């Protein structure tokens, strides 16, 4: 079973993403802050991290940089998940090294397809 770490501080968004992923057969882990997300990503090595950009203690871009600084963290796909769709924000996010960008509100169909593609590719590379 593939494991997805959700880093999200909004309870409603967390519940939606968790419920969709669990319905599709993924195991989910949850973190409500950037620092907790970094720690869990490095310690638990999930198949995918879904990282909110605006978090209370550390933004998602900074959290990604810390994950990528760790040798094992370079191999984990990390998606930016954000409601911020301003062009300058999106360019900054894309330049940060995220593997994909998912905008809120989430389109469930495309979200599930994107997650599935990345998890399958990661599983193939690790075999």
Regions found by a protein language model. Give the residues of each.
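C-terminal output helix
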Residues: 106-116
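Active-site residues of response regulator receiver
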Residues: 52, 82
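Charged docking surfaces used in two-component/phosphorelay signaling
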Residues: 15-23
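The feature encodes the CheY-like receiver
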Residues: 56-59, 74, 86
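Acidic catalytic/metal-coordinating carboxylates
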Residues: 12, 33-36, 59-65
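Conserved acidic carboxylate
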Residues: 8
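Short hydrophobic/Thr-rich beta-strand motif most characteristic of the beta2 strand and flanking loop
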Residues: 25-32, 40, 102
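Short amphipathic alpha-helix used as the core "switch/output" element in two-component signaling
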Residues: 39, 61-74
């Amino acid at each position: 079973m593939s494991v997805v770490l959700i880093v999200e501080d909004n309870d409603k968004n967390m519940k939606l993403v968790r419920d969709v992923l669990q319905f599709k057969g993924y195991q989910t882990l949850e973190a409500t802050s950037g620092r907790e997300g970094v720690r869990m990503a490095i310690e638990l090595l999930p198949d995918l991290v879904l990282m909110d950009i605006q978090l209370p203690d550390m933004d998602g871009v900074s959290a990604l940089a810390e994950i990528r600084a760790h040798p094992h963290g370079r191999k984990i796909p990390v998606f930016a998940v954000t409601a911020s769709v301003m062009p300058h924000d999106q360019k900054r996010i894309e330049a940060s090294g995220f593997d994909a960008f998912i905008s809120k509100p989430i389109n469930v169909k495309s979200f599930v397809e994107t997650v599935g593609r990345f998890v399958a590719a990661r599983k193939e590379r690790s075999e």
